[in-house]
Regions:
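Conserved segment of the helicase C-terminal RecA-like domain
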Residues: 16, 20, 38, 44-96, ...
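Conserved motor-coupling elements within RecA-like helicase/translocase cores
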Residues: 1-21
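Conserved catalytic network of the ASCE P-loop NTPase/AAA+ motor domain
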Residues: 11-16, 31-33, 78-79
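C-terminal structured domains
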Residues: 432, 436, 440-517
Length: 517
């Protein structure tokens, strides 16, 4: 509506005529319309809400708050008695929220982040009545970096200053500046409601064809044509490169480049790190790469409502400045081995992958350590006996390191890591001699004390070394009766009598004892 028509609506009538004024939420302000005597309140309000599906702010209709209802009623009778009619049951008053949420708490913060960058004002230095959520602001800044509006240290670029002057979301502004007028049709579709009925399929090219073929309702087509004309005037006319529909949408949604996951289901990982899925049987369900412009907003795995296919070469051309090769060593749970890869990455998606042939031993060992934590520690009998000896003395009060399996896994980076050189698989780990690694945990003095108080063997009067079994709580040995002849003092191990099981000449247990002679 033109400004003069708006002025005429609120000017007093001089000839006594009655008039009807349709007003937005501006009527909740201190605006006085002198001859208004009656207010009819629908109980609804239009609010700016961040639409997680489109990644932009949308206007949605919600229940008004009690505070808004009071303000609206106050427009009647500003200078004379008046009446307010509320189009809801009186009993519903208690269900209305007390106040409307601050827009900064619910809207997309991309525009705010861009304005703050233009001002050069750090958000934390501004006295917001309702400060923006740090996570939401950070997400907005990351998007602006992808759009080339901010530098890595969050400073505004010349491109960002230009986007800030455009009367539309930075996503669409960036697309129109990079692609030019050719993007005005798809920008108009992205900036309005879906022109096709639900169930028509996700492919955005269907929307473009419907607009061009005249298969849309007259009002919808007129609205889109009007929006297309408006956006053509905002587009840069310096771009002459012809781009596919997928490439143009990718300019607006660099965080929504989707790569199909392995498997039969049409599930995708997006360059921004989130997951999304197409409906089974959708025309795009076999596409290896897509650009997603609208979802249902599910934070776990969103259902894709609008998307378009894009080629790998197009992705590499459009985002050459954001694509990088990354090297990684990771433990593969499926392969039970360390996998060293060089990956061509755009955010969270992998465009190409190769074997990292010259991965450093330190990186491989660190990845193997993650495998150890997943697999657990499997000790051989000698390793288990040593560990048990230390634990037995520690439980008796000796100042020794904790060698429980839980503690050993938690501290593996300090004692096991140096011994993992050359170990890459679960089979190699199983064959690794851990005894030396376990012994390295003790100082020389601690090692001597363990050997003295909890020896690995005892020597009989006949001179034979018998291994001590520490795995059953109380240290014990088994030997033939004759080998104890000449014993005058019962052996003490770990501060307690050694349990001796005497065997017959045939090797059968005769008697366990802790008191010889």
């Amino acid at each position: 509506m033109k400004f003069q028509d708006q002025r005429a609506a609120i000017q007093p009538e001089t000839d006594g005529r009655r008039k009807l004024v349709l007003a937005t939420s501006i009527a909740e302000t201190s605006l006085t319309i002198e001859d208004i005597r009656i207010v009819v309140d629908s109980g609804l309000a239009r609010r700016a809400r961040f639409d997680a599906g489109t990644g932009m702010t949308r206007l949605v209709t919600e229940r008004a708050s009690r505070a808004e209802a009071v303000q609206r009623a106050g427009r009647a009778g500003r200078i004379a008695p008046g009446q307010a009619y509320k189009l809801w049951a009186k009993a519903e008053n208690g269900t209305l929220p007390r106040f409307a949420p601050a827009e900064i708490e619910t809207a997309d913060l991309t525009g705010l982040a861009l304005e703050l960058a233009v001002w050069g004002a750090p958000p934390e230095d501004l006295p917001f009545l309702s400060p923006p959520a740090p996570a939401a602001l950070s997400e907005a800044q990351q998007l602006l970096q992808r759009l080339g509006a901010l530098t890595p240290d969050l400073r505004i670029t010349d491109h960002g200053r230009h986007l800030a002057r455009l009367p539309l979301h930075p996503r669409l502004g960036h697309m129109l500046q990079r692609a030019g007028p050719q993007a005005s049709e798809i920008a108009a579709i992205l900036n309005t409601r879906d022109p096709l009925a639900r169930g028509a399929g996700s492919d955005l090219s269907l929307r473009i064809r419907a607009l061009r073929d005249g298969r849309l309702p007259k009002e919808v087509k007129a609205q889109l044509k009007q929006e297309t004309t408006r956006l053509q005037k905002l587009a840069s006319h310096n771009s002459s490169e012809a781009l596919s529909l997928g490439a143009m949408v990718a300019l607006a949604y660099p965080d929504r480049i989707g790569q199909r996951r392995k498997g039969d289901a049409p599930r995708y990982v997006l360059s921004g790190g989130k997951g999304a899925a197409l409906t089974e049987g959708d025309a795009l369900s076999g596409a290896p790469f897509i650009v997603v412009s609208d979802t249902d907003g599910n934070p776990r795995e969103a259902q894709i409502r609008q998307a378009v296919q894009i080629g790998l070469d197009e992705i590499r051309t459009l985002f050459s400045d954001q694509i990088a090769w990354e090297n990684s060593c990771e433990w593969s749970k499926r392969e039970r081995r360390v996998v060293a890869r060089s990956q061509e990455k755009l955010g969270a998606i992998t465009l190409d992958e190769r074997i990292w042939k010259d991965a450093p031993d330190t990186d491989i060992a660190q990845a193997m350590l993650e495998g150890v934590r997943m697999l657990g520690l499997a000790f051989s009998p000698p390793e288990e006996r040593f560990r048990t000896r230390v634990e037995l003395l520690r439980s008796a009060g000796e100042d020794l390191p904790n060698m429980s399996e839980t503690a050993l896994l938690e501290t593996a980076d300090s004692w096991l890591l140096p011994f993992l050189s050359g170990v890459k698989t679960a089979a190699q780990l199983k064959a690794l001699n851990l005894l030396e690694a376990l012994k390295s945990i003790l100082t020389w003095e601690q090692s001597q004390r363990v050997d003295k108080l909890a020896p690995s063997h005892v020597t009989t009067p006949l001179g034979r070394r018998i291994p001590v079994d520490y795995t059953h709580g109380q240290p014990q040995i088994e030997l033939r009766l004759q080998e104890m002849f000449g014993t005058t003092v019962h052996p003490i191990v770990a501060g307690q009598p050694l349990r001796v099981t005497l065997l017959s000449p045939a090797g059968r247990p005769v008697q366990p004892t802790t008191d010889i002679p």
